[in-house]
Amino acid sequence: RIDLVLFVNGFAIITMELKCNTSGQNVQNAIEQYRTDRDSNSRLLKYKIGALVNFAMDLEEVYMCTKLNGKASYFLPFNQGNGEDGKGNPEPIDKTKLKVSYMWEDILTKDTLIYLIERFIFIEKSVKENKITGVKKVDETLIFPRYHQLNAVRRIVNDVKEYHTSKDYLIQHSAGSGKTNTIAWLSHICSDLHDDNNNNIFDTIIVMTDRIIVDRQLQDAILNLSHKSGVIKVLDDKCTAQDLKTAINGNTKIVVTTIQKFRYICDEIKNSSEKKFAVLIDEAHASTSGQNMLAVKKALNASAFSSALFVST
């Protein structure tokens, strides 16, 4: 039997296989147990029917998988990161605790589980075409955040609640570690943030890339999270700088655009006075210098009363 199952209102959300290093087993044995000993077609483990995520854990490390598929089951690390290479978990300051104490002290608590269900877990849809037959198929993947993604979003959101637009931030992700989804989660959560007086902290979230066209992966990630029409405006290669001007001057909550469009409208955005912006920059190392970035800052701070927060990735 599965070692541990967490339910919310009768629905299985998380399963866990637990191993004890001092007994000669570790997290890799837990992963192997999921791959070889567990029936992925059972009601509890069947993809999109059973539990949302499956954790393999020992006393030092945690791995996760959202789609069990026998020996092909792919597990990703769900660790806090440790040292320069970022692998594993740090030694706890409190020596009475384990390296994986964050799981039951944070991740498995009621508030965090509800937050994950409400704001993070989603179905990623992508269209794949058979190169031989030309038949297109919609592929669906259940996305559960890795620990570093959840941590980055929560830390910025909690700080923004206090400081609003008075600070800027930098998120560092290694290649292939899910930067695109981190941007998508952050843009949606920031668009709903309110202060103590129930006023919106931001009027508009601008997700910006320095590529000539909006990155398709970034575009799809943000659109996959939207449940309301009219909330997001993606300014792809068919849109002009004037479309960007209209979106910023209007009431669109999330605008996805290229940085180049700002150069043509920086002197024309007049209705943004008293507006508050959050600017999420994709590939910041290539974007935060030069005339394009100066145009962005000029456009969004055109008024003495408008303000912008910049989050670079």
Protein language model annotation of sequence segments:
Residues P145, V207, S312:
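Conserved SAM-binding loop
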